[in-house]
Design a protein with these regions (language model features):
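Short, linear, compositionally biased motifs with a strong N-terminal bias
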Residues: 14-18
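Lipid interaction determinants
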Residues: 25-78, 82-143
């Protein structure tokens, strides 16, 4: 009888473990992270130089396929994007701006980073869009 109970317990444990493992995935939920979520720029890291926003609001809103970034003076950066939750690759294309950002170095860096983005890291609370390991922008969720 003890052997039967032991076998039943092991079977239940194995089934529960299998269900738990098979329902887990390492892929990010792209829709939850990006789609219709507003992000505020915290800073841009360019090698050893960190460019803080100094209290000015730079924001990005991702739609299903397009994005719009807004600078404090109302200028915009627009384009299309795609991301892969498995590899965490991130690219923007058809990126355009309404200004050349001669006096706004943060907006100029943001534009360059979006044009050359390769990866992302993060979740629904924070997001790092990366051009390379030490060149990225850090964003905080507005939700």
């Amino acid at each position: 009888m003890k052997q039967v109970v032991k076998t039943i317990k092991r079977t239940i444990f194995a089934v529960a473990l299998f269900a738990c493992i098979s329902s887990c995935t390492s892929d990010d939920d792209i829709d939850d992270i990006f789609i219709e979520r507003g992000w505020t720029l915290t800073y841009i890291q360019e090698g050893g130089v960190r460019r803080n926003t100094e209290g000015k609001k730079y924001s990005i809103l991702f739609g299903e396929a397009a994005f719009t970034a807004t600078t404090p003076d109302g200028s915009t950066i627009t384009g299309e994007w795609k991301a892969d939750g498995g590899t965490r690759s991130f690219t923007c294309y058809n990126v355009r701006s309404s200004s050349n950002f001669q006096k706004d170095t943060i907006a100029k860096s943001m534009l360059n980073l979006l044009k050359n983005a390769r990866k992302y890291e993060g979740d629904t609370h924070w997001l790092r869009i990366k051009q390379q390991e030490n060149v990225y922008m850090l964003l905080g969720s507005e939700k």
